[in-house]
UniProtKB/Swiss-Prot annotation:
Binding site for Zn(2+) 2: C170, C173, C196, C199
Name this polypeptide is given: Chaperone protein DnaJ
Family as reported in the entry's similarity comment: Belongs to the DnaJ family.
Record SUPFAM superfamilies: Chaperone J-domain (SSF46565), DnaJ/Hsp40 cysteine-rich domain (SSF57938), HSP40/DnaJ peptide-binding domain (SSF49493)
Pfam families in alphabetical order: DnaJ, DnaJ_C, DnaJ_CXXCXGXG
Function: Participates actively in the response to hyperosmotic and heat shock by preventing the aggregation of stress-denatured proteins and by disaggregating proteins, also in an autonomous, DnaK-independent fashion. Unfolded proteins bind initially to DnaJ; upon interaction with the DnaJ-bound protein, DnaK hydrolyzes its bound ATP, resulting in the formation of a stable complex. GrpE releases ADP from DnaK; ATP binding to DnaK triggers the release of the substrate protein, thus completing the reaction cycle.
Gene3D superfamilies: DnaJ domain, Heat shock protein DnaJ, cysteine-rich domain, Urease metallochaperone UreE, N-terminal domain
Gene: dnaJ
Length: 386
């Protein structure tokens, strides 16, 4: 028989926030607690609620459950950072192997040191994707963003209790956050530690009547957070920026997590970018390439004068020092490279044709040319009469 989905156990959606999960757990735990609910099956239901909360309130276990539909060693994989991969430090975390070390530690008398359930814990990190226009990425900008996050409850200041009320030590685990269970194994009677089913591993409980009316005992609420962001100059597509303390609220008075902004830059029609270097295409005529000229070349800093030497060949590149993208650290600008393309006219009027034939003759070239068609002759006549 398939096990009931843990999200269904708590009555929340799969994308529920930490605050929503905690609020649902508090409500159900108060309803099915064995001390207040003596109906048949209430204790079993209460245990299932605690098991669901133990998994879904832990970032690592929740990510593993979402991926494999289970937790612990059954998944057989490495754990991640719970909903926010790619920004933390490299390497593997213990993931699904944590349960094994707990069990073996209990069997052989050692075990890992248990974390104090009331110790402050940092909040979860968040990710925000910001789309930038090409020029805004080059020169930076100041803007405002809005996003949802869990924040410390302004009424109870994170305690979860009404003003004048407070949590008290859990009578089941006596503040330890876990209980000892004995089970028969092939090696005899063994003792293991499990998360306290009453307090969910926190070591403290708040009576339902004493819970904060705003956050319902969760200590956090969902908010639409607005933040001013100064985008630095020289940001490139795919780069990220960390804003400390702008993530979700911590637990037990712990610090907020961080916000990571990932930048997506809209391509430009005029410029191509590679790091701090800009590439531009510039069309010039045969006359300009042959005789030389000065043209206005586009740069991200505005148009500049570009000298075209006489005899310039098509696809020649010119370097404009310091006309590229400003470096993020403020240490100058990159360069720009202008590639010139000599454009050959598709049609010539009569005077242009005669001039080109004369040029060919002066160059010792026996160029016969191709006779112009009716429409070309008509166009030449029109041009000559101007």
């Amino acid at each position: 028989m398939a096990e009931e989905d843990l999200y269904d156990v708590l009555g929340v959606k799969k994308d529920a926030s930490e605050a929503e999960i905690k609020r649902a757990y508090r409500k159900l735990a108060a309803k099915y607690h064995p001390d207040v609910n003596h109906e048949p099956g209430a204790e079993k239901k209460f245990k299932k609620i605690n098991e669901a909360y133990e998994t879904l309130s832990d970032d690592q276990k929740r990510a593993q459950y979402d991926q494999f539909g289970t937790t612990g060693s059954q998944a057989g994989g490495f754990g991640g950072q719970g909903g926010f991969g790619g920004f933390g430090q490299g390497g593997f975390s213990q993931g699904g192997f944590g349960d094994f070390s707990d069990i073996f530690g209990d069997i052989f008398g050692g075990g890992r040191a248990r974390r104090d359930p009331s110790a402050p814990q940092q909040g979860r990190d968040l990710q925000y994707t910001m789309t930038l226009d090409f020029m805004d990425a080059v020169f930076g900008k100041e803007t405002s963003i809005k996003y949802n996050r869990s924040a410390e409850c302004h009424t109870c200041h994170g305690s979860g209790a009404k003003p004048g009320k407070s949590a008290h030590t859990c009578s089941t685990c006596h503040g330890q956050g876990y209980v000892l269970r004995q089970r028969q194994t092939m090696m005899g009677m063994m003792q293991s530690q499990e998360v306290c089913p009453t307090c969910g591993g926190k070591g403290q409980v708040i009576d339902p009547a004493d819970q904060c009316d705003t956050c319902h005992g969760a200590g956090v609420t969902e908010e639409r957070h607005e933040l001013k962001v100064k985008v630095p100059q020289g940001i490139d597509d795919g780069q990220q920026m960390r804003l400390q303390g702008q993530g979700e609220a911590g637990k037990n008075g712990g610090p907020y997590g961080d916000l990571y902004i990932v930048f997506r830059v809209t391509p430009s029609r005029d410029f191509k970018r590679d790091g701090n270097t800009i590439y531009v295409d510039q069309d010039i005529s045969i006359s300009q390439a042959t005789l030389g000229d000065h043209v206005q070349a586009k740069t991200v800093h505005g148009d500049v004068d570009l000298k075209i030497p006489a005899g310039t060949q098509s696809e020649t590149k010119f370097r404009l020092r310091g006309k590229g993208v400003p470096r993020v650290n403020g240490n100058g600008n990159g360069d720009e490279y202008v590639t010139v393309h000599v454009k050959t006219p598709k049609t010539l009027n009569k005077r242009q044709r005669e001039a080109m034939l004369a040029f060919a003759a002066a160059s010792g070239e026996d160029v016969k040319g191709v006779k112009a068609g009716f429409f070309d002759k008509l166009k030449d006549a029109f041009e000559d009469n101007k």
